Amino acid sequence: GELIMSEVKMLTAPVPNVPWQERPQGPQNGAPIWRYSENPIIGRNPLKGVARIFNSAVMPYGDAFIGVFRGEQTNGIPYIYLGHSKDAIHWDFEENKIPFVDENGEPFMPVYAYDPRLVKVEDTYYIIWCQDFYGAAIGMAKTTDFKTFTRIENPFLPFNRNAVLFPRKINGNFMMLSRPSDSGHTPFGDIFLSESPDLVYWGKHRHVMGKGSEWWESLKIGGGAAPIETSEGWLLFYHGVSGTCNGYVYSIGGAILDIDNPSIVKYRCENFLLTPEEWYEERGFVPNVCFPCATIHDSASGKIAIYYGAADSYVGLAFTKLDEIVDYIKTNSVVTSADTEIGRR
C-alpha cells in the first residue's frame, strides 16, 4: 500500500538512556527494524548452573535497568533469575533463583518457570510467567523493591501462557492478554483479553486476534512485549509461528489495539517485522526462533529497543523508531472480522 505518514507520539515517560544504535547504511528489506551489531547480548553459560538465558523481560529502574530472565538450568529445568544493568546491554545476574513467597510470606517455588514478562502498573512491578498448574498455566507475582516477590494466586485455569499485562489500568481494571492452548506444544493459539479489578478475579474475556492467513503466522500467535501506549493506540509486538515440514519458525509481528477497548484491533501488519536470519536466531537449542518479551522505549525521541529470545539460546536486541514502525504497520495492515469478535453470532 501507499506509505501512511503518522504524527504519532508515545504516551509514556521519557527514558533518555534507552539503548540505541543507529540504523546501518545500505538497502533495507522489509520492516524498519534493525539488529544490534553486537548481538547476541547474552550468550551461553551466562552464570553458574545456567546453560542458556533467552526469552526475558527488562525495564528501566531508577537511572539504570532491571530484568527477569529465563534461565535454563544445567538440569534442563527453566527458572527465573534477576538481572541488573547500567546500559541495558551488559547484564549482571543474581546467582540464586528469584525467591517467591506466597501471600502469607511462606516460600513458594514453582516446579518450573519460564518466558517471564515484567510490567510496572502504578507503583508495583509485576512478573508474569508460565508455570506448572496441572499443565502449562500463568504464574504471577508482585514486588515493589525487587527483594520480596509475592506470588499471586493462579489467575487462570490451565492451559494458558504468553500472558502480558498492560502497563496501566483501563476503565479502572487491570488488563491482560493471554494465549489459551492445549496441553502440549500447542498446534493452535489465539490471543485473548481479560480484565480484573484486583488481579484475583478475571473476566470479561474477549477475543483479540487469531492466527493469520499469512503463512509466517498461520499456525499460532502469542503476546510478546507489554503494549506501548501511543496516540494511535496500544502498539503490540507479538510472535507468530509458521509450521514447516522441518519444525516451527517463530517471527515477530506488530499490531495496534484500540486505546480504550484493546480487544479491537485497529491495524495488524500483514508482514513479519523480524524473522530468523542471523546465526544466533537460526542455530541453537530450538532453531529458528525470534521471541519478543520486552521493549525499552523513549517518548522524547521515539526510540524503541526490542528484546527477544533467539533460538531458545540467546538474547537479541533490535531497534526501531515509533513513527516508522507505526507507519509500516498501518501501511501493510490487514484486519479480519475475527480480530474484533466477542463471540456473538
Protein language model features and the residues they cover:
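Beta-rich carbohydrate-recognition and catalytic domains
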Residues: 3-111, 119-219, 228-288, 299-303, ...
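Catalytic core of Fe(II)/2-oxoglutarate
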Residues: 225
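C-terminal substrate/ligand-recognition segments
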Residues: 293, 297
